Curated annotation (Swiss-Prot):
Additional observations: In the RecBCD complex, RecB has a slow 3'-5' helicase, an exonuclease activity and loads RecA onto ssDNA, RecD has a fast 5'-3' helicase activity, while RecC stimulates the ATPase and processivity of the RecB helicase and contributes to recognition of the Chi site.
Alphabetical list of Pfam families matching this protein: Exonuc_V_gamma (PF04257), RecC_C (PF17946)
Species per Swiss-Prot/TrEMBL record: Buchnera aphidicola subsp. Baizongia pistaciae (strain Bp)
Keywords noted in UniProt: ATP-binding, DNA damage, DNA repair, DNA-binding, Exonuclease, Helicase, Hydrolase, Nuclease, Nucleotide-binding
GO BP: double-strand break repair via homologous recombination
Designated name of the protein: RecBCD enzyme subunit RecC
Taxonomic placement: Bacteria, Pseudomonadati, Pseudomonadota, Gammaproteobacteria, Enterobacterales
Gene assigned in the entry: recC
GO cellular component, one term: exodeoxyribonuclease V complex
Family: Belongs to the RecC family.
Described purpose of this protein according to its UniProt entry: A helicase/nuclease that prepares dsDNA breaks (DSB) for recombinational DNA repair. Binds to DSBs and unwinds DNA via a highly rapid and processive ATP-dependent bidirectional helicase activity. Unwinds dsDNA until it encounters a Chi (crossover hotspot instigator) sequence from the 3' direction. Cuts ssDNA a few nucleotides 3' to the Chi site. The properties and activities of the enzyme are changed at Chi. The Chi-altered holoenzyme produces a long 3'-ssDNA overhang and facilitates RecA-binding to the ssDNA for homologous DNA recombination and repair.
């Protein structure tokens, strides 16, 4: 007998199952009861519930439905192989192995018919066939009977050809044509003829809410119900047949006895039969439910046709809150069309203190988690009967939230700490998986600085060569200092530019080993090897570990680079695992799953006798497509709140259910590239899989499963918290449904739009972009913030005698080193953070200095310019310097290196000539003067030209930092000595002259910049590159005044914005982390402030300098 139980309460299902077990005990008490569930989470919940309710949970065997059916089929099909001939990978390898199919696929992808592409197509076609075997067995049957599927000839012709080739290939190999679809069909036929072996069937089976269930599975269960009792528990939001189904449909199923074939014909037919009419009527006659439970309704229709008996497990919901009233309305199908006055008269008042259902709108993921944490603390503090394990948090895409969950929940104070467990692991984030992929991908990578640095982040590799965490920074320093790029000399043999070995590992090792014996002095080298002797004994030992790691990786790179037979890959993969992982690591659940998938891929190909050699890259790609995530059901109900990915715990009751990330893209948007050939898409039927419709149904069931509180959060796009926009459709439906049956203010009760505003203001909460924004403290919040820092800030606001923003204490007058003053004015904002606040922000990107094989980077170029100029000035041998840079690897050891060196000499020679023209005898002078209110300025002025003035040069283009540095030195010179011009020279024939100043004027300016230093150490001075470029464009250097022309002003503004925003080649100033702390959004007010600051500090410089060119 097939007994259908309908309810929404999962605990009622388990109670009903045990009522049967207790009232009808099995003859053999040792026989196990069979429970069929969807997932491990449901299995664990049932075990815990039984153990709590009946004190013991034993003698129960849990199955997934497909595995249960497969076990029964094996008992009745002696020829059924343990490994299916029509599994996903078996079909894929058959497609790859059959020459006719390869030729056909080559025509389909004529634009790109590489072997890699054909491999991907075979995998996609295999996925399609798996769908057909499950949801379109009639198509498979027609193909095998050599008949066409109506209206799909062009789309299905080549698929039919491939399928028939697979069937022929299988027959030729003397293997039975036993795919799952055929096995189900044949077994159902046998049961109809009473030829089915039922001796090993269980006496009864209990099936708990298997959704979605395909018609073929349902008919099979109906068929075996002749031999054993089938108890099917179906969780549904509406279980009253008289409300769900039309009178004609109820009469039809009561008067008609429908065979299995008739059932299938009703499903397969596209004519408007009773099922399709019923679905259409349901969608027409409902408003709310038709949006949410269409998929469930289709399932209910079919189950109602095959069941022998229906038991409705009724229950009552206490109606004490908005959530409970809403649940009751939905369960009683209160959206069936009624007269407006009937709805209005039955509206229910929502109390202002009712927080049982609320919706929270946030701008960012981290803000969502902050709001989640605060709301949970608020509820838990107010409800002592709610334990941590009574809380369930669901997300459709938990991966994106996990970093923020760990950050927010783990950083809470001990008083506000909430223990949590995440019932989900994305396999692709598992360390074992990432390490395996890195190792398998060795043939496709070059072991340069970037890659080696990345590999040092993999704990498994570090453990292999005994590198600890403290040694990693040292290794990174070693890698950058030694400038080693490539792993061996063989790579260079195919280099068309030339044979540069200065940065390969072997040459690098020679430098380091030589450095242990010979010192690197005065740019000397030995046999074209420059010794590297900056290693201490500790560094040298650590570097030896790195050598061991690189040697091991090179060994495996060589092994994995060559294509191999599948049997060889099977052995090689086992050796790879044993070489890098311990037995314990290989036995972890995640590792076992990955190893199992790899083995399945390899062994399926070996079973199909694939005899060609194959690269490991193709196997790696298939492995990446095969693994997804693993659930961690052992962490469920362990005294912590549970974070759950997707709706795996739907229908399991929790006191608090919180749904995060409920945006319009809640359903999966991933589309297979072969969707255009998918016959399910071309001719959809009832009961076809549809993520979007199914997720709507699961969302509604989740709402109905919450006992006390149901919260939703989503993201909005707008940064304006006052503007409510982008409300997801699902949330909008819930709000409007509540408006239809509930009200806040009696005066707006009968006006839908006014009532809608009242409802929104009560249940819909729109949060600010940041937790610390002023609005959070000035307004009375329904959901207080428990973050310790935020509370301290709020306390400051609430106390009127304290200021919310405090100024830093003033710096007392003190002795200042002149170099400190210059350092400040080179970058006032950064110096404020470094010196005043002691804050260092990371401004470097994840790039390495020496990653290019043949070209020199800017820093090395500057160092080389500076050293070459020094050699010129001291009349030293520049050829030796050239050879040194080639041997050390700064300059490529090829023709490009010669070109770079000639370019450098051409750049520096004019600079040297100009210096020698101006330079006389250069002197240095120490000073210590009182400049302002007992503030002593001390230091040393260098390179004072005997002919008068300062002489400064820079072996690169002159920048603002060079100009302001020389300007401050010039002010000091004019304050101390006679009036003379000072000169600053740069490359590209640049020369800047600083005009001589009166002693009084120079002191005035110097005091002004010293005062600016003190002010800037209390409140940052907005002296930015954008402002500097703006003032250079707006200042008329010839006439020493600012342009007033509108076009000039507009052009200067464009230059300002270009510098601020940057482009594809130059990073914008807005990306500077220090400036980001000062200017979050660039407003007109900020721009004017930058203009004003730039004018104040740079105008004196522009008025007292001149630009010229030297020859």
């Amino acid at each position: 007998m097939f007994t259908l139980y309908k309810s929404l309460k999962f605990n009622l299902f388990v109670k009903s199952a045990f009522k049967v077990i207790l009232n009808e005990p099995l003859l053999n008490p040792l026989t196990k009861e069979i429970f069929i569930v969807n997932n491990k989470e449901t299995e664990q919940w049932i075990k815990i519930f039984i153990a709590k309710k009946y004190k013991v949970c034993t003698n129960i065997k849990f199955f997934k439905l497909k595995h249960f059916i497969l076990n029964i089929l094996k008992q009745n099909t002696p020829k059924l192989y343990s490994k299916s001939e029509f599994s996903k990978y078996s079909i894929m390898w058959k497609i790859i192995n059959i020459p006719d199919i390869q030729h056909l696929l080559t025509k389909i992808v004529s634009k790109n018919n590489t072997y890699s592409t054909l491999f991907k197509i075979a995998s996609s076609i295999s996925n399609l066939f798996q769908l057909y075997l499950k949801y379109r067995p009639d198509y498979i049957k027609k193909w095998e009977q050599k008949s066409n599927i109506p209206k799909t000839r062009l789309k299905q012709k080549w698929q039919q050809i491939i399928w028939m080739r697979i069937i022929k290939y299988t027959k030729d190999a003397n293997k039975p044509i036993l795919h799952f679809s055929n096995l189900l069909y044949d077994s159902i036929k046998k049961m109809q003829r009473n030829n089915f072996i039922n001796t090993k069937l269980p006496v009864r089976i209990f099936i708990f809410n298997i959704t979605p269930i395909t018609p073929q599975y349902a008919i099979f269960l109906k068929s075996i119900s002749k031999y054993c009792s089938v108890h099917f528990f179906y969780a549904t939001a509406s279980y009253n047949d008289k409300q769900m189904f039309s009178t004609s449909f109820i009469k039809f199923k009561q008067t008609q006895e429908i065979s299995n074939n008739q059932l299938l014909s009703l499903l397969h037919s596209k004519n408007k039969n009773i099922i399709y009419h019923e679905i259409e009527n349901f969608q027409k006659n409902t408003k709310f439910q038709s949006y949410w439970i269409t998929y469930e309704y289709e399932q209910m229709l079919f189950l109602s046709l095959i069941k022998d008996k229906t038991i409705n497990l009724n229950f009552k919901i206490k109606q004490n809150s908005l959530l409970q009233y809403l649940q009751n309305k939905i369960l009683n199908l209160h959206s069936i069309q009624k007269k407006n006055n009937e709805q209005e008269n039955n509206k229910i008042l929502i109390l202002k203190t009712d927080k049982s259902l609320s919706i929270h709108s946030c701008h960012t993921l981290i803000r969502e988690i902050e709001v989640l944490h605060n709301n949970l603390l608020n509820i838990l503090n107010d409800n002592n009967d709610i334990l941590f394990q009574d809380v369930l948090v669901i997300s459709k895409n938990l991966d994106t939230y996990i970093p923020y969950i760990n950050q927010i929940f783990n950083s809470a104070s001990s008083k506000n700490f909430i223990p949590f467990s995440i019932n989900y692991k994305n396999i692709k984030n598992i360390e074992f998986y990432k390490t395996i992929l890195e190792l398998i991908d060795l043939p496709n990578i070059e072991l340069n600085i970037n890659k080696i640095t990345n590999l040092l982040n993999i704990p498994t590799l570090l453990k292999k060569v005994q590198i600890n965490e403290q040694e990693i920074p040292i290794l990174l320093q070693i890698i950058n200092q030694t400038e080693i790029q490539w792993e061996n000399d063989n790579i260079l043999s195919n280099d068309w530019l030339s044979n540069d070995i200065t940065k390969c590992w072997e040459h690098g090792l020679q430098r380091i080993f030589l450095g242990q014996i010979i010192n690197n002095i005065d740019y000397k080298f030995w046999e074209n090897i420059v010794p590297y002797n900056e290693f201490s004994t500790l560094y040298y030992n650590i570097f030896n570990k790195l050598i061991s790691l690189i040697s091991l990786l090179n060994k495996w790179k060589k092994i994995l680079s060559k294509p191999k037979f599948l049997s060889h890959w099977d052995i090689t993969f086992k050796k790879l695992l044993n070489d890098f992982f311990t037995d314990h690591e290989q036995k972890q659940p995640e590792a076992k799953l990955i190893i199992k998938k790899w083995t399945e891929i390899i062994h399926s190909g070996m079973q199909e006798k694939y005899t060609k050699k194959i690269s490991i890259t193709l196997l790696k790609n298939e492995l990446c497509n095969s693994v997804s995530y693993i659930s961690q059901s052992n962490y469920l109900f362990s005294g912590k709140i549970t974070f759950c990915n997707n709706f795996t715990l739907t229908n399991i009751p929790f006191k608090i259910i919180y749904l995060i990330g409920l945006n319009d893209n809640i359903s999966s948007n991933t589309h297979e590239s072969f969707d255009i050939y998918n016959l399910l898409k071309l001719h959809p039927r009832a009961y076809d899989p549809c993520d979007e419709i199914n997720h709507k149904n699961l969302l509604l069931k989740t709402l109905l499963s919450a006992k006390k509180f149901f919260y939703i959060s989503h993201q909005i796009v707008s940064n304006n918290y006052k503007k409510l926009n982008n409300i997801p459709i699902a949330i909008d439906k819930i709000i409007k449904y509540i408006t239809q049956y509930f009200y806040i203010k009696n005066k707006n009760k009968d006006n839908f739009n006014d009532n809608l505003k009242d409802i929104k203001s009560h249940i819909y909460h729109n949060y600010t972009f940041y937790a610390h924004e002023k609005r959070n403290f000035l307004e009375k919040l329904n959901y207080p913030n428990f973050n310790t820092t935020i509370w301290k800030m709020a306390t400051l606001i609430n106390n009127s005698h304290k200021e919310f923003i405090k100024k830093l204490p003033s710096i007392k007058n003190q002795t200042i080193n002149y170099n400190t003053l210059i350092l400040f004015w080179k970058n006032p904002i950064q110096t404020f953070f470094h010196v005043r606040l002691n804050i260092q922000l990371n401004t470097t990107k994840n790039k390495h200095m020496h990653q290019n094989k043949h070209f020199i980077n800017k820093l090395d170029q500057y160092k080389m310019n500076k050293t070459l100029l020094k050699f010129f000035l001291y009349k030293q041998n520049t050829n030796q310097l050239f050879q040194y840079y080639k041997n050390i690897g700064i300059i490529p050891n090829n023709n490009i290196g010669n070109i770079i060196w000639e370019y450098t000499k051409k750049l520096i020679t004019p600079l040297y000539d100009q210096i020698m023209k101006i330079k006389k005898i250069l002197n240095n002078s120490k000073f210590c003067i009182n400049v302002k209110n007992k503030c002593m300025l001390h230091g040393q002025l260098k390179n004072i030209n005997s002919s008068g003035g300062l002489l400064r040069w820079k072996a690169t283009k002159l920048s603002f930092q060079d100009i302001i540095s020389c300007w401050l030195e010039h002010l000091l010179y004019c304050s101390l000595y006679k009036k003379h011009n000072s000169i600053l020279i740069g490359t590209n024939h640049q020369i800047i002259t600083f005009y001589k100043l009166e002693n009084k004027t120079a002191k005035y300016y110097l005091k002004k910049y010293i005062s600016g230093y003190f002010d800037g150490m209390e409140q940052p001075i907005l002296l930015t590159k954008s402002g500097i470029n703006w003032i250079n464009a707006i200042y008329d250097k010839k006439n020493n005044k600012f342009y007033t022309n509108t076009n000039k002003n507009l052009n200067a503004y464009k230059i300002f914005l270009n510098t601020w925003n940057g482009n594809n080649w130059i990073t914008g100033e807005k990306d500077d982390p220090y400036i980001q702390k000062m200017i979050v959004y660039l407003t007109k007010k900020n721009i004017q402030k930058i203009y004003k600051t730039t004018k104040k500090w740079l105008t004196p410089i522009l008025k007292n300098i001149s630009y010229s060119k030297y020859h």
